[in-house]
């Protein structure tokens, strides 16, 4: 840009606004912010610049100023449907649900065909457990735009949580988690064709827990006659997954994998759909993962010698969208478990929270093994020597279930994961293995832990 053009732009709010949008689209957020703020200095009532500055700040996590920008923009121009939507999304993240509902409703009053607003309102209603209304919103969005993948994906979670698997798995195919890997594949995606004598590459998806839960489908592919099955997985799962029946080769995703070879590829989480899984036909042959005997022998001497041995996991991955609700805020919430006679505790906490295992009481006395684990094969070997695992919703709970190790799962009331269904105290994914302890109200872990303590006391007395 010539110097003269720069001067003209710097004095023109509309040109600054356009430059800000261009910078925002290319990820140059600092330049975008400077453009929007300069535009507003020149034209304080520039509603669109105020709204876009709010969006930029919102994406950066500065929600206080972002909300102020949104509300200022709407005061200047109340007919900005997109800004009502953005404000609703911000309020939803802050759990200010009535205000969020009002914002989305206003967006739809302005534009009844606003598919994103219908979908977001559906998400909000699902959070509020108004599931009939949530479903109506998702279906309205899809009626307006049958190709709107976000609404279809959101609908899948609602249907799966309700056990309506036929349509739920079909809608779940709207996800795009595997898209970057899929773009590298040269062979066709498997759509249920005959696998006799064929090779297939299974792509990893989601987190460690997703991989462990849905790894159960690998033997089903072998039963269909697949000659060779290669499983791509997270590095920390590689050794553990070598014990998975049907997996001929296990490759961590940080290593090269044969994208150009094989007859078919498939994302792991598409296997329930292609296998026609229903609530009464979940592959549930437990265990389907196994501890390594040498590792068991190595970890066994480190376990408590006396009493019932119980493993504890009180935090999941901090990267999970619902971590603030599904993880315990502190290990100290489990302090009452330390007074149950005849029980010894082992920390299986790895990463976030593992430092708490070294704290003195009021936390229950722990043998800290989590900080020493290298991968999930180590965790499996430790669990082999335990009598029970008590865990928040985490990959470790899935590991216990897949190993056939009794596990008590502590679940939040807010955004309870779809896979634990509604109101059940058991799981058809891990029959006879998992017992679910659910919050009755959002954030109330004290009641859940009191129930766990009473159950643990009864078990220890046996």
What are these regions (language model features)?
Residues 1-388, 393-462:
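Alpha-helical solenoid repeat scaffolds of the TPR/TPR-like class and their adjacent stem/linker regions
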């Amino acid at each position: 840009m010539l110097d003269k053009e720069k001067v003209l732009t710097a004095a023109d709010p509309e040109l600054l606004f356009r430059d800000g949008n261009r910078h925002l689209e290319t990820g140059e957020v600092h330049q975008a912010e400077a453009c929007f703020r300069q535009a507003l200095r020149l034209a304080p009532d520039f509603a669109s610049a105020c709204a876009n500055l709010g969006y930029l700040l919102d994406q950066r996590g500065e929600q206080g100023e972002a909300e102020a920008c949104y509300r200022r923009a709407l005061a200047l121009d109340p007919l900005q449907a997109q800004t009502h939507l953005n404000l609703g999304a911000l309020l939803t993240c802050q759990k200010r649900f009535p205000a969020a509902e009002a914002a989305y409703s206003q967006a739809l009053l302005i534009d009844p065909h606003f598919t994103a607003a219908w979908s977001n309102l559906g998400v909000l209603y699902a959070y509020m457990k108004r599931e009939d209304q949530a479903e109506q919103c998702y279906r309205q969005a899809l009626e307006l735009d049958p190709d709107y993948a976000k609404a279809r994906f959101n609908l899948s979670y609602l249907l799966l949580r309700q056990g309506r698997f036929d349509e739920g798995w079909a809608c779940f195919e709207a996800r795009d988690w595997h898209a970057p890997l899929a773009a590298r594949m040269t062979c066709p995606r498997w759509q249920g064709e005959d696998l006799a004598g064929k090779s297939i590459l299974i792509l990893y998806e989601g987190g460690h827990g997703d991989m462990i839960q849905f790894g159960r489908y690998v033997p089903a592919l072998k039963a269909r006659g697949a000659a060779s099955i290669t499983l791509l997985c997270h590095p920390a799962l590689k050794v553990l997954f070598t014990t998975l029946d049907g997996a001929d080769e296990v490759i961590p995703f940080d290593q090269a994998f044969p994208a150009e070879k094989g007859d078919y590829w498939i994302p792991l989480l598409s296997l329930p759909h292609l296998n026609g899984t229903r609530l009464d036909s979940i592959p549930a042959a437990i265990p389907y993962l196994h501890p390594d005997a040498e590792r068991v022998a190595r970890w066994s001497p480190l376990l408590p010698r006396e009493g019932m041995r119980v493993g504890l996991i009180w935090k999941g991955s901090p990267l999970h969208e619902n971590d603030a609700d599904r993880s315990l805020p502190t290990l100290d919430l489990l302090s009452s478990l330390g007074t149950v006679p005849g029980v010894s505790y082992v920390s299986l906490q790895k990463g976030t929270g593992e430092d708490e295992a070294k704290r003195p009481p009021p936390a229950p006395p722990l043998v800290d093994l989590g900080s020493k684990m290298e991968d999930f094969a180590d965790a499996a070997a430790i669990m082999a020597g335990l009598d029970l695992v008590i865990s928040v919703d985490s990959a470790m709970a899935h590991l216990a279930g897949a190993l056939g190790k009794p596990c008590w799962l502590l679940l939040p009331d807010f955004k309870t994961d779809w896979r634990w269904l509604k109101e059940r105290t058991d799981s058809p994914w891990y029959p006879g293995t998992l017992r679910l302890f659910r919050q009755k109200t959002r954030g109330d872990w004290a009641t859940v832990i009191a129930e766990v303590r009473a159950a643990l006391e009864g078990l220890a007395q046996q």
